[in-house]
A protein has these predicted regions:
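Catalytic-core signature of thiol
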Residues: 1-234
Length: 234
């Protein structure tokens, strides 16, 4: 089983994640863009949009580095559900739910049905190795060369990224991740070793009719579940 989206460009953006720990906000922004790309259009956004939401969802204060501490994914997603992800001309509201991060089949279903899976991973120092041109390893894998640094998950901290497609389901089959404004290849065994949380997002304002996207009673049930979650979190 594979999910081939090589003919569709989700055009991920950096959205400030090269200078700030706003990967949770950038992940939501790029999820919007991935969803739009699958529907045949695109949604414009910029660094200011991502930083504004990062501030709203985490308490980051621009110009005060001590407040740049990243975000907790469920808290950030709850902020998006409650307040929306504000862009210059519109505010987009997701509904969302969490999945068992050890259930890779479930994550594949999220990726296929909801445009991309929103993941939290523990990066290793070996994942952050760069060649002489400043490029990351072409494929993230668990058998990185010894000179690439510590391969221990978490030795480079946590990160939020999106899973976009995959060539198969075997351990060494490749997935495409959307992170830092680019497509990054990894193996499924890398995903298994690094993943710590997984979430699905759906955008009622963006999706095109048809396909695997929830509609009708399924959509109503998701909305009701999110409303109940917000009521409990209030």
């Amino acid at each position: 089983m594979r999910l081939d989206r090589s003919g569709i460009n989700p055009t991920p953006l950096m959205l400030g994640n090269d200078v700030l720990g706003d990967c949770t906000s950038a992940g939501i922004g790029n999820h919007i863009r991935a969803t739009a790309a699958l529907a045949g259009f695109q949604v414009a956004m910029d660094v200011a949009d991502a930083v504004r939401f990062y501030s709203r969802s985490t308490g980051y204060v621009p110009g005060r580095p001590a407040t740049d501490n990243g975000g907790v994914e469920v808290d950030v997603l709850t902020t998006a559900l409650r307040d929306g992800y504000a862009l210059e001309t519109q505010t987009l509201f997701p509904i969302w739910g969490s999945a068992d991060p050890t259930d890779l089949n479930g994550i594949r279903n999220i990726t296929a049905g909801l445009s991309a899976a929103y993941l939290g991973v523990q990066l290793a120092q070996a994942d952050m190795w760069e060649d002489q041109d400043g490029n990351l390893p072409p494929v993230w894998d668990t058998d990185s060369p010894a000179d690439h640094g510590d391969p221990t998950p978490g030795s480079a901290g946590g990160h939020c990224l999106l899973l976009w497609d995959y060539t198969g389901t075997a351990d060494t089959d490749l997935v495409t991740l959307l992170t830092w404004g680019a497509k990054q290849k990894a193996t499924w065994r890398w995903v298994r070793s690094r993943i710590m949380e997984a979430h699905g997002l759906a955008w009622g304002q963006l999706h095109a009719p048809g396909g695997l996207y929830p509609t009708g009673d399924d959509w109503a049930a998701l909305v009701a579940a999110n409303d109940a979650y917000l009521a409990g979190a209030a």
